[in-house]
Amino acid sequence: MSLNVKQSRIAILFSSCLISISFFSQANTKGIDEIKNLETDFNGRIGVYALDTGSGKSFSYRANERFPLCSSFKGFLAAAVLKGSQDNRLNLNQIVNYNTRSLEFHSPITTKYKDNGMSLGDMAAAALQYSDNGATNIILERYIGGPEGMTKFMRSIGDEDFRLDRWELDLNTAIPGDERDTSTPAAVAKSLKTLALGNILSEHEKETYQTWLKGNTTGAARIRASVPSDWVVGDKTGSCGAYGTANDYAVVWPKNRAPLIISVYTTKNEKEAKHEDKVIAEASRIAIDNLK
């Protein structure tokens, strides 16, 4: 091969790479602009992190900024219970008894079964799928070691950003600038990937965790609303009830494609502001479009 031919082929290859890089850069910039416009209309902050686990392509916006967790930590609480079962420290079939004084506002499942108690496994599922506050605080207190124990569990899986400082319902203040009970969209997404798709949980516990996520009842208007109806979604939402603060994170299983990990967090500066599910759904749609 002559030197000129070789140089020409190298030049063509280099040009092709530049074109590809330019294409993806333009697509990503377009997505960022869309999120910025959405954020302006929302009049608050939006944090997004999305990952295609097949291609490795990601999309992010304010992904390393802190946002209030609200109830979204309960998805990781359920995983901590499964890890405890896997390590033979906890028994999912153990019946947990309690009285109504143990139950906070919004405890629909634990209230229903207050007379006979619930299994620990069912209680963990209730915390995730129904955001049951009674189940959450009972599990935190008796089996996890409180907020400090929950934070310690997240450190054990490599998450250095998550912090839980308070119990339900106190953790829902969502005061701007308050780092208590916060994490970042990127850290949340990566921890979800680790727990739902990684090797921290055994195949049996991981299958249970995915089933619990898929059975969540609180997210129909958020990430689930941003994807085609034949895609499977497993998610956990959070809503603080103050400063328009709400969030959602999910594993999304598209048809004929590797799973996606999506994390969307939103908050405002006005205490009485209402959260907006449609903003979470739209931010998720934009992120997913930019993973193609």
UniProtKB/Swiss-Prot annotation:
Residues 1-27 form the signal peptide. GO terms for biological process: beta-lactam antibiotic catabolic process; response to antibiotic. Keywords: Antibiotic resistance, Disulfide bond, Hydrolase, Signal. Disulfide bonds join 70-240. GO terms for molecular function: beta-lactamase activity. Substrate binds at residues 236-238. The active site is at residue 71. It comes from the Bacteria. The keyword Disulfide bond applies. InterPro entries: Beta-lactam/transpept-like, Beta-lactam_cat, Beta-lactam_class-A. It catalyses: a beta-lactam + H2O = a substituted beta-amino acid. It holds the Pfam family Beta-lactamase2. Its EC number is 3.5.2.6. Hydrolyzes carbapenems such as imipenem, which are extended-spectrum beta-lactam antibiotics. The class A beta-lactamase family has a specific amino-acid numbering system, sometimes called Ambler or ABL numbering and often misspelt as Amber. A multiple sequence alignment was used to derive a consensus sequence and then the consensus was numbered taking into account insertions and deletions. This allows use of identical numbers, e.g. for active site residues, despite differences in protein length. UniProt always uses natural numbering of residues, hence there appear to be differences in numbering between this entry and some papers. Belongs to the class-A beta-lactamase family. This is Imipenem-hydrolyzing beta-lactamase.
